[in-house]
C-alpha cells in the first residue's frame, strides 16, 4: 500500500489566506475584499448601535491591479488575510512580453509577464541598456506580479 503513494508533487498545503478578527486589522495591512487581495488604505469604525455590533468600514486597493474595493463588516467577525510572499529575482532576459528571471537556486523562470505601464517601460529600458537589475515579485492567492525594480547588489 505504501509503495503506491506519491508525495513528490504539490505544495506544502499552506492556505492562501488566514482568518483575522475585523477589529484587529490595521491600515497598511492586507485583507481579502470581494475575493481580491488588497492593501488597507482607509479604515473607520462605527459605534455599536441599539442592536448589534460595532461595524468596521474597510477601503482597500487590489495589490495586483490597483482597483479600489470597499466592505463593511461587524468588528467581531473574521476576515480573510492573504498570505503574501515577496521574492527578488535577477532579470536575465525579456522575450515575447515575458520576463526571464533567475532564482536564487539558479533556476530560470519564464512564466511572468512583463508588467504594463511605467514599470514595464522602466524594466525594458534598463534591460536594453544592459543594466543588472532585480525584479521584485509579489505573490498571493495563486497570482503573481512584478511590482518593483532595483539595481543588483
UniProtKB/Swiss-Prot annotation:
GO cellular component, one term: endoplasmic reticulum membrane
SMART domains in alphabetical order: eIF-5a (SM01376)
Gene Ontology biological-process annotations: positive regulation of translational elongation; positive regulation of translational termination; translational elongation
Topology of this chain in the membrane: Peripheral membrane protein
GO molecular function term, any single one: RNA binding
Location, primary (coarse class): cytoplasm
Localization: Cytoplasm; Nucleus; Endoplasmic reticulum membrane
Post-translational modification N-acetylalanine, affected residues: 2
PTM-bearing positions, type Hypusine: 50
Family: Belongs to the eIF-5A family.
NCBIfam families membership: eIF_5A
Function as written in the Swiss-Prot or TrEMBL entry: Translation factor that promotes translation elongation and termination, particularly upon ribosome stalling at specific amino acid sequence contexts. Binds between the exit (E) and peptidyl (P) site of the ribosome and promotes rescue of stalled ribosome: specifically required for efficient translation of polyproline-containing peptides as well as other motifs that stall the ribosome. Acts as a ribosome quality control (RQC) cofactor by joining the RQC complex to facilitate peptidyl transfer during CAT tailing step.
Known partners and oligomeric status: Binds to 80S ribosomes. Actively translating ribosomes show mutually exclusive binding of eIF5a (EIF5A or EIF5A2) and EEF2/eEF2. Interacts with DAPL1; interaction takes place at the polypeptide exit tunnel of hibernating ribosomes and prevents translation.
Name of the protein in its database record: Eukaryotic translation initiation factor 5A-2
Species, as recorded: Gallus gallus (Chicken)
Amino acid at each position: 500500500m505504501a509503495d503506491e503513494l506519491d508525495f513528490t508533487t504539490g505544495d506544502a498545503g499552506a492556505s492562501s489566506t488566514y482568518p483575522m478578527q475585523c477589529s484587529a486589522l490595521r491600515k497598511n495591512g492586507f485583507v481579502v475584499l470581494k475575493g481580491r487581495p488588497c492593501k488597507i488604505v482607509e479604515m473607520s469604525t462605527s459605534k455599536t448601535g441599539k442592536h448589534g455590533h460595532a461595524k468596521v468600514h474597510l477601503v482597500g486597493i487590489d495589490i495586483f491591479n490597483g482597483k479600489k474595493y470597499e466592505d463593511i463588516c461587524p468588528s467581531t467577525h473574521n476576515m480573510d488575510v492573504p498570505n503574501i510572499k515577496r521574492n527578488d529575482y535577477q532579470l536575465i532576459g525579456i522575450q515575447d512580453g515575458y520576463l526571464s528571471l533567475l532564482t536564487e537556486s539558479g533556476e530560470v523562470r519564464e512564466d511572468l509577464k512583463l508588467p504594463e505601464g511605467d514599470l514595464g517601460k522602466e524594466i525594458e529600458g534598463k534591460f536594453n541598456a544592459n543594466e543588472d537589475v532585480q525584479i521584485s515579485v509579489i505573490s498571493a492567492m495563486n497570482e503573481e506580479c512584478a511590482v518593483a525594480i532595483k539595481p543588483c547588489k
